A protein has these predicted regions:
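Residue-level signal for inorganic ion chemistry
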Residues: 30, 85, 171, 209
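Conserved SAM/SAH cofactor-binding pocket of Class I
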Residues: 57-148, 154
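SAM/dcSAM-binding transferase cores
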Residues: 180-231
Length: 231
């Protein structure tokens, strides 16, 4: 907890002690549920703080995050990065999405129990949710830590972002080749040139894609197609 609290204070998070405590309660709840439903492979508390909490908060240092009020998290799993961001930035609204109904119910329930009111978690595949008018071309920012190739992840995520908004993908240290291969897909989906920003944490990278035009109606393709036939 001390490491998490130090990090929150380092980045001038208001009410850092309270938010650090809330996140630690969230961790305990996730780990308890994890014995019944697969929410995370990380069960060591120090590693959880490093790889789930601090890692999730890396994008908050960016101007793009600061300027955003509506944020969606695609493939949230156990609530990452969406829940840590929502806890630390209660003035922003978060929509979290996951394809497994059990995970959605659990994350919703834990957030409700802890009083995290700026989070909504919905069940569905990104390819289908992005076809719904209430979600399409709507968000200032889309974030995702989902394990998927950038060509696939862009088709999942960019349709949710409004023109002028940003998509941020959490990636590993050596993602240049993957991002180069995704340039055509990003352009097709209304995005501009991807920008890789290195972080000081765990050698991770954040890939920023600004969206300059609405995503064409043809995308995303039907559920399962993006993964099988990447753009």
């Amino acid at each position: 907890m001390n490491e998490l609290l130090s990090y929150l204070k380092q980045f001038d998070i208001e009410n850092a002690e309270e938010k650090s405590g809330l996140l630690m309660q969230y961790m305990q709840s996730v780990l308890e549920w994890n014995e019944k439903v697969n929410l995370t492979a990380i069960t060591d508390t120090e590693e959880f703080v490093q790889k789930h909490f601090i890692d999730s908060l890396l994008c908050a240092e960016s101007l793009e995050f600061t300027a955003s009020s509506s944020i969606c998290d695609v493939g949230t799993g156990g609530g990452f990065p969406g829940v840590p961001l929502a806890v630390c930035y209660p003035d922003k609204e978060f929509l979290l999405m996951d394809s497994l109904a059990k995970r959605v119910r659990i994350v919703n329930d834990i957030c409700a129990q802890l009083g995290v009111t700026n989070v909504t978690v919905v069940h569905g595949r990104a390819e289908e949710l992005a076809r719904q008018l209430e979600y399409r071309d709507r968000f200032d920012l889309c974030v995702s830590r989902a394990v998927a190739n950038m060509r696939v992840l862009s088709e999942y995520c960019l349709p949710f972002v409004r023109a002028g908004g940003t998509f941020i993908a959490y990636k590993g240290p050596d993602c240049e080749s993957e991002i180069n291969d995704a340039r055509r897909a990003v352009r097709l989906l209304g995005g501009e040139e991807p920008e890789i920003r290195k972080t000081s944490h765990l050698d991770h990278s954040l890939v920023f894609v600004r969206k300059s035009a609405p995503t064409p109606d043809a995308y995303p393709r039907k559920a399962g197609v993006p993964a099988k036939k990447p753009l």
